[in-house]
């Protein structure tokens, strides 16, 4: 029925892309659209502009409203989840979170953590934090670690539940993070070292390390 535009009464627009739909169908599946079409100015409008929504995500979500089917992929999950979150399509949001959960790896877990935090995916965030703590040594060797800012590194290495073979790994990761952009990160070293358990490092190790890195 929607494909034929039969009796459609609203056009959703995202970045110039248009999708025709029925207000009643959208409102029945989405609290976001229910509120829009019953209590806001948009209830009398035939065209609705959705800002910050990816056009392909809009297409997939409107199709989901009519079919209860959506395919989450590596290519669309980062645009689909925010759009589903906005439209309060909780089943799609959960499907996206489940997909990301199954994709967790030392090379991407920091990015997934940030993404989950940004979009309020609390269960995914909790599982990701646990994953990072248990794979901490591997995470420190991945590119995402070097893209963190100072505050994020502090939060990461200050956890009491991280799993590392020795505190030397944490110390070396801090030095490596600073050296990755030393002109801009050098001043952060003293604060970062506040979170390294220096008493767990041997005196000889520290002396050798300082001689190399000073």
Language-model region placement:
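BTB/POZ-protein C-terminal extensions
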Residues: 114, 118-214
């Amino acid at each position: 029925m929607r494909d034929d535009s039969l009796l459609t009464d609203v056009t959703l627009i995202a970045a110039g892309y248009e999708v025709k739909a029925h207000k009643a169908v959208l409102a029945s599946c989405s609290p976001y659209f229910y509120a829009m079409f019953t209590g806001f100015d948009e209830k009398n409008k035939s065209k609705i502009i959705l800002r910050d929504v990816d056009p392909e995500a809009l297409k997939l979500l409107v199709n989901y409203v009519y079919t209860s089917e959506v395919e989450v992929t590596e290519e669309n999950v980062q645009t689909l989840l925010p759009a589903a979150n906005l439209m309060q399509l909780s089943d799609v949001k959960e499907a996206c979170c489940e997909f990301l959960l199954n994709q967790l790896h030392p090379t991407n877990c920091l990015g997934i953590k940030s993404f989950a935090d940004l979009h309020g995916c609390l269960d995914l965030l909790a599982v990701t934090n646990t994953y990072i703590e248990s794979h901490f040594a591997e995470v420190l060797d991945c590119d995402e670690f070097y893209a963190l800012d100072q505050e994020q590194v502090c939060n990461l290495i200050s956890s009491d539940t991280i799993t590392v073979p020795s505190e030397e790994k944490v110390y070396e990761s801090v030095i490596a993070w600073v050296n990755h952009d030393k002109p801009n990160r050098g001043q952060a070293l003293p604060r970062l070292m506040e979170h390294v358990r220096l008493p767990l490092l041997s005196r000889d190790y520290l002396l050798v390390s300082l001689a190399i890195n000073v």
